[in-house]
């Protein structure tokens, strides 16, 4: 029976959440700690404090002979306010004042909430993209771009000097490039790019000339062959035939036969060397 009485007594002791805080209040009783052993469930409303005199002693502060340090007034303590006003601890905690800007935020970011933030420089607008101003995302301010390349307009005097230099040297050296840049009031990069473009143009012109010359040369070679193949009969008669290997008929035989100076036994046509010419038969 004694064990059961002790068990029920202990159970009644732990039923009250703040039972361990009760006791005789000393003269310098400090603020009682808040109930921290409760779980995540919301705490029930605490019962009224059985010692109202203790609150008066707490509000007066600790005596100077016990604590040499200054003790802040207990009215600002959340635990004392929790016990004094019988409210939950969550409502008794002071809320931080809501400033105009959150911590770590810049004022310029909140001034323009509709402004589009572009973290990359290549996403910024350029002068060439004028269509961006027509869509809703083009409302952001375009910063001036100093590194944007613009097309260089060369004057006639500059082009004349560059063409002269290119006529003598297709590939310009570094010292000469520096000299031309100073003389023409240009940068080395401008001169280098101009020479690169001029070389490409010159190579295209050379390739075009080579292709046209090959076509013309092929036609010129083929035309004489066609003229020699297509000839008339009169031209063939006018040309002397090649001499035979045996040499029986002189080269002037065709001309003499045409003029009628050959004897009747000889023929104007060439004969092979294996066949001897016929002699005229003598009358019997």
UniProtKB/Swiss-Prot annotation:
Motif mapping: Nuclear localization signal: 198-204
Bias (Pro residues) ranges: 41-51, 239-253
InterPro entries linked to this entry: HD, HD_metazoa, Homeobox_antennapedia, Homeobox_CS, Homeodomain-like_sf
Antp-type hexapeptide, short sequence motif: residues: 119-124
Region feature (Disordered): 34-75, 202-284
Pfam families: Homeodomain (PF00046)
Superkingdom as given in the UniProt entry: Eukaryota
One GO MF term: DNA-binding transcription factor activity, RNA polymerase II-specific
Modified residues (Phosphothreonine): 152
Keywords, in A-Z order: Activator, Cytoplasm, DNA-binding, Homeobox, Nucleus, Phosphoprotein, Transcription, Transcription regulation
Subcellular localization, as worded in the UniProt entry: Nucleus; Cytoplasm, Cytosol
Domain notes: The Antp-type hexapeptide mediates heterodimerization with PBX on a regulatory element of the somatostatin promoter.
Family as reported in the entry's similarity comment: Belongs to the Antp homeobox family. IPF1/XlHbox-8 subfamily.
Quaternary structure (record): Interacts with the basic helix-loop-helix domains of TCF3(E47) and NEUROD1 and with HMG-I(Y). Interacts with SPOP.
Name the record gives this protein: Pancreas/duodenum homeobox protein 1
Record organism: Gorilla gorilla gorilla
Annotated gene: PDX1
